[in-house]
């Protein structure tokens, strides 16, 4: 049994299979509704039911309050149709978004690389190429691990038959612990994707700033490789933050790219390097490196941020003080079920991010 869901104001119609959520069906049919967490805690995918009956699912009471339930609002990531539906969604069409449909893939681990003491590079050969846009992510399923985990793609879209993921070891994390300690080359895994709307806005003028911290380097790496492969002539500057030299990974890749491409600059920053006499680069936090590099003036540029929430919030503050605005700054924040829907899970400065 399946039901048709009409999405207003665009008028698009999707077919939702029995037991499938509205969001799952939409993404797999190339219809991109706003979403973030995917499990009912952040409220990004809230929509209005205009006609029809729906099971609201396991939506958090913080993300979907009682009064909103009475008003027939639902979270698309949890809601399962019980009849044909008409819903109203805040669909913000972006001319630069390619909207590749989400599909399921099988893969085999082709390489495991120690990028740093806490970050491992996971390479997976897929059963077929996966079209995606640089900056997007996949949901990875692992043997014996409940649920899926989201990891950004580090490879460029031109190499879409083998994906590269950067996995930071999280203390107590079942999935990251499994990847770091048990997963082996040749093991079979499954994944779905692509997900996410973190991508370079090619139609928008302005030079590009990338600020990355930790394993958050993955998306900027994919974006920068894609831009340079396509011959983009805008000035591109990557600021990569880490605690120390051991945690600063793939620096040789970006140094080599900077040597070959005059429009690309690479600025690494270490925030625990005061006792490292051999470190000749920037000493301090990565947002301060960006401020120093541009003398605190960022006007006319577009910024893409990826990393731990404290780094992102500090970078947003620095960029806005340097005359960038909400429309100039892009990021994607991953949520876990433990994050809840509190204000701390979003930027205190922007409504959009």
Swiss-Prot record:
Limits of the 2Fe-2S ferredoxin-type domain: 3-93
Broad enzyme group: oxidoreductase
Tree of life domain: Bacteria
GO cellular component: extrachromosomal circular DNA
E.C. designation(s): 1.14.13.244
Pathway: Aromatic compound metabolism; phenol degradation
Sequence positions that bind [2Fe-2S] cluster: 37, 42, 45, 77
Ligase in keyword set: no
Domain FAD-binding FR-type: 102-201
Phenotype of the disrupted gene, per the record: Cells lacking this gene cannot grow on phenol.
Cofactor(s) in the UniProt record: FAD; [2Fe-2S] cluster
MF annotations from Gene Ontology: 2 iron, 2 sulfur cluster binding; metal ion binding; phenol 2-monooxygenase activity
Listed InterPro entries: 2Fe-2S_ferredoxin-like_sf, 2Fe-2S_ferredoxin-type, 2Fe2S_fd_BS, Beta-grasp_dom_sf, Cbr1-like_FAD-bd_dom, FAD-bd_FR_type, FNR_nucleotide-bd, OxRdtase_FAD/NAD-bd
GO BP, sorted A to Z: aerobic phenol-containing compound catabolic process
Transmembrane segment boundaries: none
Assembly with partners or alone: The multicomponent enzyme phenol hydroxylase is formed by DmpL (P1 component), DmpM (P2 component), DmpN (P3 component), DmpO (P4 component) and DmpP (P5 component).
Function: Part of a multicomponent enzyme which catalyzes the degradation of phenol and some of its methylated derivatives. DmpP probably transfers electrons from NADH, via FAD and the iron-sulfur center, to the oxygenase component of the complex. Required for growth on phenol and for in vitro phenol hydroxylase activity.
Protein name stated in the entry: Phenol 2-monooxygenase, reductase component DmpP
């Amino acid at each position: 049994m399946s039901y048709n869901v009409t999405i207003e104001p665009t008028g698009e119609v999707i077919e939702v299979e029995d037991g499938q959520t509205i969001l799952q069906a939409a993404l797999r049919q190339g219809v991109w509704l706003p979403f973030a967490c995917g499990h009912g805690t952040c409220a990004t995918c809230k929509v209005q039911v205009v006609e029809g009956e729906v099971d609201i699912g396991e939506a958090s009471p913080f993300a979907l309050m009682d009064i909103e339930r009475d008003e027939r609002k639902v979270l698309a990531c949890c809601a399962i149709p019980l009849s044909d539906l008409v819903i109203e969604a805040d669909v913000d069409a972006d001319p630069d978004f390619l909207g590749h449909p989400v599909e399921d893939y099988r893969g085999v681990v082709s390489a495991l690389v120690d990028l740093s003491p806490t970050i491992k590079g996971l390479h997976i050969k897929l059963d077929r190429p996966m079209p995606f846009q640089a900056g997007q992510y996949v949901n990875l399923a692992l043997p014996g691990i409940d649920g899926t985990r989201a990891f950004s793609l580090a490879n460029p879209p031109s190499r879409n038959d083998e994906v590269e993921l950067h996995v930071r070891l999280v203390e107590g994390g079942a999935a990251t612990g499994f990847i770091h300690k048990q997963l082996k080359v040749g093991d079979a895994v499954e994944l779905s994707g692509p997900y996410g709307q973190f991508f370079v806005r090619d139609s928008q003028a302005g030079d590009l700033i990338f600020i990355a911290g930790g394993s958050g380097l993955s998306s900027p790496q994919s974006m920068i490789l894609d831009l340079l492969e396509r011959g983009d002539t805008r000035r591109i500057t990557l600021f990569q933050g880490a605690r120390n030299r051991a945690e600063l990974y793939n620096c040789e890749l970006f140094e080599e790219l900077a040597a070959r491409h005059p429009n690309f600059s690479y600025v690494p920053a270490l925030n625990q390097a005061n006792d490292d006499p051999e470190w000749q680069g920037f000493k301090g936090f990565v947002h301060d490196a960006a401020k120093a590099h541009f003398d605190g003036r960022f006007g006319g540029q577009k910024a893409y941020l990826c990393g731990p929430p404290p780094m992102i919030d500090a970078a947003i503050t620095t960029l806005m003080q340097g005359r960038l605005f909400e429309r100039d700054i892009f990021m994607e924040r991953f949520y876990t079920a433990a994050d809840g829907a509190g204000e701390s899970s979003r930027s205190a400065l922007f409504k959009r991010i």
